[in-house]
From Swiss-Prot:
The gene is tmem198. It is a multi-pass membrane protein. Keywords: Cell membrane, Cytoplasmic vesicle, Developmental protein, Membrane, Transmembrane, Transmembrane helix, Wnt signaling pathway. It comes from the Eukaryota. It comes from Xenopus tropicalis (Western clawed frog). Belongs to the TMEM198 family. Disruption phenotype: Morphants have defects in neural crest formation. At the tadpole stage, animals are often less pigmented with ventrally bent tails. Embryos develop smaller eyes and forebrain structures. The chain crosses the membrane at residues 32-52, 55-75, 90-110, 112-132, 141-161, 174-194, 210-230. GO terms for cellular component: cytoplasmic vesicle; plasma membrane; vesicle membrane. InterPro entries: TM7S3/TM198-like_dom (IPR025256), TMEM198 (IPR040236). This is Transmembrane protein 198. GO terms for biological process: Wnt signaling pathway.
């Protein structure tokens, strides 16, 4: 009897309960904490999408924070550490602390930040490819999504290091649009789209998406293209993160050069003060003051011939005779000769 009742209830032709869930009129209950978090994420998504490259350092910090926190949270909460299952609050605290360290590294070391930005872009594009592939082909092995995600992430990370501005703009716009899409999915259908994407990564079967889920998913490429155009034409035009680095280096070099010049000037002044000596006044010569050595020699012979000594001659002379062995001697022509009595 009960079996017949069960068969009758099954054969009544009722619709699948999931079909009723796709109706927008179904009641949904929102928690306070996820609602506040999604509201804040909407603000971050807008900044990422339209001002990503302009706020370069902030974006590098947030990229490292989100990536590090997500990876550590999944490892701590999903896996057993030292034979103990960590609680949700403890896992979130550990993930936040390590995420802050990762954010500081990506902000201070630009190459690491750019590499992380390229990784995020590659992962997002790989996830989008898996969602599109599921509509035509279900991957039989888990290595297919893993290989696709790893290859795409490494490819776009290298491309971001090569063409930094272009792929930074593309990555920030795409990631910001993904954040806005996830927040919209929470407010409309309580993360059904996110659960569907997560099932694609685990290769598990899930219910097909509702019609408005595809509308929400279509917001992602539209917002991405809009963000790329706005950044390239408005917010990121005329701005380059490399100019900021070069200008700071130039300022440091200019300060070093100024200090080196000041030090050289001080050394030169000190050396000049130590070696400065007053020069002697040059000897004044007049026309006709130079006498031939032969004339002086004959004058001496005349003086010695009369018996006058050199000492008496020096006392009677009114002018001192200067001897110069290189250019001759110089004496004034007005010098008076001693009187010799015969």
């Amino acid at each position: 009897m009960l079996q017949n009742i069960d068969n009758r209830t099954v054969d009544t032709g009722q619709d699948d309960p999931f079909d009723g869930f796709c109706s927008l009129e179904s009641e949904r209950h929102y928690d306070v904490v996820p609602t506040v978090v999604c509201s804040l994420c909407c603000l971050f998504g807008l900044v990422y999408t339209f001002f990503g490259y302009r706020c370069f350092k902030a974006i590098m910090f947030l990229s490292g924070l989100l990536a590090g926190s997500a990876v550590i949270f999944l490892l701590c909460y999903k896996e057993r550490i030292m034979d103990t299952q960590l609680s949700l609050e403890l896992s979130a605290g550990i993930a936040l602390g390590i995420g802050l360290l990762c954010g500081l590294v990506t902000m201070l070391v630009h190459s690491v930040g750019l590499f992380m930005t390229g990784l995020l872009l590659g992962l997002l594009l790989a996830i989008a490819s898996l969602v599109g592939l599921e509509q035509f082909y279900h991957p039989p092995s888990a290595w297919i999504p893993v290989g696709l995600m790893m290859g795409s992430a490494m490819l776009f990370a290298v491309l971001t290091l090569q063409w930094q501005k272009l792929f930074t703009v593309v990555s920030t716009a795409t990631f910001g649009a993904a954040i806005l899409t996830v927040c919209t999915d929470y407010f409309i259908e309580l993360m059904l789209l996110v659960q569907y994407v997560y099932d694609r990564l685990r290769l598990e079967t899930s219910h097909p998406l509702c019609w408005y889920s595809w509308v929400i998913l279509g917001m992602w490429p539209v917002l991405s293209v809009l963000g790329i155009v706005v950044q390239w034409k408005l917010t990121a035009e005329g701005f380059s993160h490399t100019d900021v680095i070069i200008s700071r280096r130039q300022k440091r070099l200019q300060l070093l050069r100024i200090r080196q010049k000041d030090a050289k000037k001080r050394q030169n002044v000190a050396s000049q003060e130590g070696t400065y000596r007053r020069k002697a006044n040059p000897m004044k010569r007049y026309t006709g003051d130079i006498l031939a050595p032969s004339y002086l020699q004959s004058l001496r012979e005349r003086q010695t011939g009369t018996g006058t000594s050199m000492s008496s001659l020096s006392t009677n002379m009114q002018t001192i005779v200067d001897m110069d062995y290189e250019c001759g001697s110089t004496v004034p022509l007005t010098a008076t000769t001693p009187v010799i009595h015969v």
